[in-house]
């Protein structure tokens, strides 16, 4: 089966005025080897690849080791979305973003400002300030945030044209742990929203796309799968399926059973004598 995450021409993903061919964004860390990373990217055909300037290789053969990784990114020819992973202060975020812009020659930045090292939860108290400063400096900011409605609204208020709420803490693979909040957030905000972090299964991605989310960003679920390449394809298909289902319009849930086959009359053998 050939997997392609291309989207219909009449239903593009648009972020900061730029149109993308896919609604899947893919991280580049923790893959067993550069070859598997490359194959997974080719299978998933993502809109963008996220990469951190604060990489530290676990082993010489890791997918993120040395200059070879940067050469691989260039060879893949997929737009790179630099991130500020590992930053714990607004000052760190600004410095890292500026270095990323110079290195990759791009105004795009995935804003990550961590407030707790155990859960990797965003620092919601300083996130809006960081986003505001980056936007004033000319960045196109995609902020990693929680599903908190007020926080996301504040990010939009300071100029973020898209937000990226988590489904669950980074790397947990638990899927949407607060469906109510995520669905409410989708209902209340009109800007593009991509679920970032915590997705573990293609069904998780399909679910949030069915709710009307505009895309997903994932990494660990593919990188740590037994077969990363096949899993990348499965997620690409799931994102497409979820988007198609959302556009098709799901039936309303019912509290009681409804016969799928209409009964227009009573069979003759049921008539009383």
Swiss-Prot record:
Q: Keywords assigned by UniProt?
A: Cytoplasm, Schiff base, Thiamine biosynthesis, Transferase
Gene Ontology terms for molecular function:
thiazole synthase activity
Question: Tell me, what is an example of a GO biological process annotation in this record?
Answer: thiamine diphosphate biosynthetic process
InterPro entries cross-referenced by the UniProt entry: Aldolase_TIM, Thiazole_synthase_ThiG, ThiG
Q: Which Gene3D superfamilies match?
A: Aldolase class I
- Note the Pfam families from the entry: ThiG
Q: Where does 1-deoxy-D-xylulose 5-phosphate bind?
A: 171, 197-198, 219-220
Does this entry carry the keyword Ligase?
no
Q: Which GO terms describe its cellular component?
A: cytoplasm
Where is this chain's protein located in or outside the cell?
A: Cytoplasm
EC number per UniProt: 2.8.1.10
Renumbered residue ranges of the record's region Disordered: 251-273
Q: Where is the active site?
A: 110 (schiff-base intermediate with dxp)
Q: In which pathway does it act?
A: Cofactor biosynthesis; thiamine diphosphate biosynthesis
Catalytic activity field: [ThiS sulfur-carrier protein]-C-terminal-Gly-aminoethanethioate + 2-iminoacetate + 1-deoxy-D-xylulose 5-phosphate = [ThiS sulfur-carrier protein]-C-terminal Gly-Gly + 2-[(2R,5Z)-2-carboxy-4-methylthiazol-5(2H)-ylidene]ethyl phosphate + 2 H2O + H(+)
Function, as annotated: Catalyzes the rearrangement of 1-deoxy-D-xylulose 5-phosphate (DXP) to produce the thiazole phosphate moiety of thiamine. Sulfur is provided by the thiocarboxylate moiety of the carrier protein ThiS. In vitro, sulfur can be provided by H(2)S.
Q: Which family does it belong to?
A: Belongs to the ThiG family.
Query: Quaternary arrangement and interactors, per the entry?
Result: Homotetramer. Forms heterodimers with either ThiH or ThiS.
**Name by which UniProt lists this protein:** Thiazole synthase
Source species taxonomy:
Bacteria, Pseudomonadati, Pseudomonadota, Betaproteobacteria, Burkholderiales
